[in-house]
Amino acid sequence: MERHKLQYEVLNHHNPNGETGQHWEVEVHASPEELQTFTEMGYLVREGLFQGEALQKLRDALDRLEEREWEKRDNAIAGKKGWGFIPRHLMDKDEVFLDLLKFQPTLSIARAMMGPLVRLRGLSARITYPGDGREHQTPWHQHMRVISNPIPPWFSRPHCIDCLIYLDDLNEDTGAVAVVPGSHDWLDKASPTIHEPVEGEVHLQVKAGSGVLIHGNLWHRGLPTLNAKRRMLILSYTPTWLRKSPHGGAQPKDGLTHAFLEDADLEERMLLGVGGYS
């Protein structure tokens, strides 16, 4: 995997010791050409982000969480919706997930695309199940549905990078992910709420441990999970001045990040939404 370095200076000279930091050096886990492709297409495939023991640790942690939250899981399955079971606040629930806070293969790309001042919007999972009598796929959707029409002169376009990390192979049994390249730049229309194919869509099948990084407003959908359970993580980044994801309600009062923040450094605090504003 090709890498290159970026250096940023945050123009905050009146407060050089403030919560933004002033000088940042980022070793980006991607080539400039790959970043340009990401800019234009709205998605970037990263093969083999996790392999061997690292992949198994994530699978085991998610399986443990699925069993602990079995009531929510069973309700999601009974609801017969194609979204499956979506546990939230994963970094508060297992050290294995908290270890992803500074995962450079994705974090460095987020900083290359959005600047050094980024935070975690959240870490969630989505588990879909085969079976009769329910929907097995998701409709077309976007994750940052806040664009108004017409666009105001000083409208702040929302940017978000969602890293879809697949813990199982994507194939015809588990369901591939479909995307529409370039649709993240379509500010004049929203994604349709249908399951059917649309013009220009691309189907992506990757091996377990791989990731598909998408702009939060890229049109995408999950194809049917027909014969085997599909597990995925959703690791999301935004600029520090965007709030964290509202989905999933309040974080657990006994969550792991509370104690972690007591001794966290500037970067860790920023990633968890404390600091990075001025």
Model-assigned labels for residue ranges:
Residues E2-M41, E47-S148:
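Non-heme Fe(II)-dependent double-stranded beta-helix
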Residues F50-G52, A125-P130, R145, L170-E172, ...:
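Short, solvent-exposed loop/turn segments at secondary-structure junctions
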Residues L123-A125, C163-I165, L233-Y237:
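A structural signal for short, well-ordered beta-strand segments
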Residues D94-D99, E199-E201, H220-L223:
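Active-site rim elements
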Residues G131-Q205, K244-G248:
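Catalytic core of non-heme Fe(II) oxygenases with the double-stranded beta-helix
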Residues E2-E25, G211, L218-S278:
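Non-heme Fe(II)/2-oxoglutarate
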